[in-house]
């Protein structure tokens, strides 16, 4: 078969945002109605290729060096020398998608540091229902084969259907990355390729935590346990988690980069992700021993201590039980005692699929809510509580807890009643941005109790003074540079505000905040309503204007008694040059043109006496505000000082408008000069007053025809 080149067409920029919002409203993004990633429709593409007798080649993730990586696996790397992209049909005469069902031994690590991902895939094979949510049925290298396959992944709140071709990186006729112990089986290699596609390259998968894979295969939420301070009932927690299909992974921390994948005396690998695949209590010489089953994604290098493959402890176990536990040699899977597990490993990750309350003795479905947000320099990226001047500008979300948890049958009055909930903060698309030198930011969140005087109020973004005088009630266990930070809380009924942030201010990123509660709870994103509290503007007739001002105007305007754009620029720059305390490069011709257009009521492109009088009074007012909020007296305002100044001037704006304002009016260092400040406030005030004039029925809605819209936007 020839190869078929099909270039996908999909929306970008603003049109993509509009399309995404419409898709959500239509229910797209649920697993049963997954979004077609990059607009690629698996069935349409497959049929298209079959009709033309051509094998699919994916130009959205082509078989080229850039798809391998950008640094260690970049186009000029020695590690990629000799790599050839080949289809399984070129490697084997009888390639198979899945042989005798998917099993843990189908996943063996190759020359890529994505053991965390492979540990997650291995855990996925323990639950056939979960597996086939990710790996759809009906795919093969025989019936209907067209060189195209697809997989479904959870990506930041929505399920996407990802199409790949079956051209895989090989060297000397063997797969370079993940492969199956069953040589001619390819589902795991193709799933790895789909995951590499959504993250931009294979190299982007290097290094990570198993929880990432867990969540992207299930849409669940992961909890972490530091084994040095684990709860006393952790083994029971593990048993329950495995029983209800949760995915589990564990690892050994490293103290230095030299320890990475170092092998211990008893053949455990440091800094390496293992999957937990089973747990069992066995009778050993009359005593019950807790065992735990692990798997190394390498497919080899196994624990050699007590209860390892072939160890003497197995001789003391009933032969039937020994056979049930299927002790095998060198398949990467092994048993060890839970006591040794606690001593040898550092961290355990459990991905709750529902999620369920693992600390409870019975299953409980949690109520879930998901919010998407952004951190933007100068507007919504305020950093953590260590930065009180900017912390308040971070996005804020309110939680209203009303119903307390059901009584715990194992609790004998030792705990006060409270409301359990779990918060999970996830940063988006950071792996995909690695090729641009960006990696995971250090993230976390704080939870504040709303004081009685503010309870029940509509969405109001809490300001700086609140956080200066109130301590957090709870917070994430740590700020850490992982994709997700999650923490379980139990707080009394009441209203609380969650503030997610990066550790340092001005670190940009997109995030998802997920909220899970055992009982129903109200949640909402806090954002100020857009409004302006402006005094009635006194518009004087020419006769009422002060004679001294008239005299000044005659000198400035010249014979035609009107001020042009160039004349306005000369006037304003002459004035501000006398104020040595102001940092400014002067008003540009474009900014003066914008002011004239906004203030020009008769449409002649110039300002008459009355129009100039209005502008003059506004600028004098803006100058006093500017000086008031130039807190460090630097001659300019920071983006955050400007936000307070705008509010003092009478404007309440939401996060999106502040983002736009900072993007348009601040310098690269986020400083706002006086001229930009004036241009911003002139525009805001004029547009608010203009809208108020048109909103005759005071319903907050104005309808424009195309001509009016163009007229407004062209002159704004």
Curated annotation (Swiss-Prot):
Q: Which reaction does it catalyse?
A: Broad endopeptidase specificity
Which residues are listed for Ca(2+) 1 binding in this entry? 109, 114
Renumbered residue ranges of the record's region Domain IV: 545-715
Would the keyword Calcium turn up in this protein's UniProt record? yes
Give the record's keywords alphabetically: Autocatalytic cleavage, Calcium, Cell membrane, Cytoplasm, Hydrolase, Membrane, Metal-binding, Phosphoprotein, Protease, Repeat, Thiol protease
Q: Which cofactor does it need?
A: Ca(2+)
Pfam families cross-referenced by the UniProt entry? Calpain_III (PF01067), EF-hand_8 (PF13833), Peptidase_C2 (PF00648)
Residues the record lists as binding Ca(2+) 4: 630, 632, 634, 636, 641
Q: Name one GO cellular component term.
A: plasma membrane
Q: Which InterPro entries match?
A: C2_III, Calpain_cysteine_protease, Calpain_domain_III, Calpain_III, Calpain_III_sf, EF-hand-dom_pair, EF_Hand_1_Ca_BS, EF_hand_dom
| Residues reported in the UniProt entry to bind Ca(2+) 3 | 600, 602, 604, 606, 611
Give an example GO biological process: proteolysis
Residues with the Phosphothreonine modification: 354
Query: In the record's cofactor note, how is the cofactor described as bound?
Result: Binds 4 Ca(2+) ions.
In the Enzyme Commission scheme, what number(s) does this protein have?
A: 3.4.22.52
User: Could you describe the post-translational modifications of this protein?
Assistant: Undergoes calcium-induced successive autoproteolytic cleavages that generate a membrane-bound 78 kDa active form and an intracellular 75 kDa active form. Calpastatin reduces with high efficiency the transition from 78 kDa to 75 kDa calpain forms.
**Location of region: Domain III:** 355-528
Task: List the catalytic residues.
Answer: 115, 272, 296
Give GO terms: molecular function aspect only. Answer: calcium ion binding; calcium-dependent cysteine-type endopeptidase activity; peptidase activity
Residue ranges occupied by any EF-hand domain in the UniProt entry: 543-578, 587-620, 617-652, 682-716
Calpain catalytic domain span: 55-354
Q: Which family does it belong to?
A: Belongs to the peptidase C2 family.
Recorded hits in PANTHER family, A to Z, give:
CALPAIN, CALPAIN-1 CATALYTIC SUBUNIT
Specify the protein name: Calpain-1 catalytic subunit
User: Origin organism of this chain?
Assistant: Bos taurus
């Amino acid at each position: 078969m020839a190869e078929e080149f099909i270039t996908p067409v999909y929306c970008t920029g603003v049109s993509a945002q509009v399309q995404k919002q419409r898709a959500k409203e239509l229910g797209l993004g649920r697993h049963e109605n997954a979004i077609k990633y990059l607009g690629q429709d698996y069935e349409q593409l497959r049929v298209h290729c079959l009709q033309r007798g051509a094998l699919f080649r994916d130009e959205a993730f082509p078989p080229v060096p850039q798809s391998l990586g950008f640094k260690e696996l970049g186009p000029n790397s020695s590690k990629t020398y000799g790599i050839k992209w080949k289809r399984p049909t070129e490697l084997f005469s009888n390639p198979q998608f899945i042989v005798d069902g998917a099993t843990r031994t189908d996943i063996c690590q190759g020359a890529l540091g994505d053991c965390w991902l492979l540990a997650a895939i291995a855990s996925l094979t323990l639950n056939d229902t979960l597996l086939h949510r990710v790996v759809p049925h009906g795919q093969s290298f025989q019936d209907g084969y067209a060189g195209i396959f697809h997989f479904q992944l959870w990506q930041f709140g929505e399920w996407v259907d990802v199409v790949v071709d079956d051209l895989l990186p090989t060297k000397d006729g063997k797969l370079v990355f993940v492969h199956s112990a069953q040589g001619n089986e390819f589902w795991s290699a193709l799933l790895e390729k789909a995951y590499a596609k959504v993250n931009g390259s294979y190299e982007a998968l290097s290094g990570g935590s198993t929880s990432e894979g867990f969540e992207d295969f299930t849409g669940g939420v992961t909890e972490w346990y530091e084994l040095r301070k684990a709860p006393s009932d952790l083994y029971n927690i593990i048993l329950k988690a495995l029983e209800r299909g949760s995915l589990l992974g564990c690892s050994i921390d490293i103290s230095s980069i030299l320890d990475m994948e170092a092998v211990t005396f008893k053949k455990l690998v440091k800094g390496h992700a293992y999957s937990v695949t089973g747990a069992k209590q066995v009778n050993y010489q009359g005593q019950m021993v807790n065992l735990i089953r692990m798997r190394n994604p390498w497919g080899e290098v196994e624990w050699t201590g007590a209860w390892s493959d072939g160890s003497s402890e197995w001789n003391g176990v009933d032969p039937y039980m020994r056979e049930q536990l299927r002790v095998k040699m060198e398949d990467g899977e092994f048993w060890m005692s839970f006591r040794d597990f606690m001593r040898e490993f550092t961290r355990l990750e459990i991905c709750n699929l529902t999620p369920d309350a693992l600390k409870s003795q019975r299953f409980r479905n949690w109520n879930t809510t998901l919010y998407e947000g952004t951190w933007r320099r100068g507007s919504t990226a305020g950093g953590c509580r260590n930065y009180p001047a900017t912390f308040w500008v971070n996005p804020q979300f309110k939680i209203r807890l009303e119903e307390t948890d059901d009584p715990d049958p194992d609790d004998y009055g030792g705990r006060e009643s409270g409301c359990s909930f779990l918060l999970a903060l996830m940063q988006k698309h950071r792996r995909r941005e690695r090729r641009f030198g960006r990696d995971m930011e250090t993230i976390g969140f704080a939870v504040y109790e709303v004081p009685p005087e503010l309870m029940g109020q509509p969405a109001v973004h809490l300001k700086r003074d609140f956080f200066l005088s109130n301590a957090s009630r709870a917070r994430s266990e740590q700020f850490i540079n992982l994709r997700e930070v999650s923490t379980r809380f139990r707080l009394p009924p009441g209203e609380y505000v969650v503030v997610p942030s990066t550790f340092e201010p001005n670190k940009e990123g997109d995030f998802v905040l997920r909220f899970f509660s055992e009982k129903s709870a109200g949640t909402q994103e806090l954002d100020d309503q857009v409004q302006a509290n402006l005094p009635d503007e006194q518009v004087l007739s020419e006769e009422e204007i002060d004679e001294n001002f008239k005299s000044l105007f005659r000198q400035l305007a010249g014979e035609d008694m009107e001020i042009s754009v160039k004349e306005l620029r000369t006037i304003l720059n002459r004035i501000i040059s006398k104020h040595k305390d102001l940092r400014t490069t002067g008003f540009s011709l474009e900014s003066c043109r914008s002011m004239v257009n906004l203030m020009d009521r008769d449409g002649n492109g110039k300002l008459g006496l009355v129009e100039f009088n209005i502008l003059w009074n506004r600028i004098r007012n803006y100058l006093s505000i500017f000086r008031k909020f130039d807190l460090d007296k630097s001659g300019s305002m920071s983006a955050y000082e400007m936000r307070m100044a705008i509010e003092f001037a009478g404007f309440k704006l939401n996060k999106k408008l502040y983002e736009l304002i900072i993007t348009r009016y601040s310098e690269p260092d986020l400083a706002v000069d006086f001229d930009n400040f004036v241009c911003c406030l002139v525009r805001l005030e004029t547009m608010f007053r203009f809208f108020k004039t048109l909103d005759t029925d005071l319903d907050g809605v104005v309808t424009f025809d195309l001509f009016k819209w163009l007229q407004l936007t062209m002159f704004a």
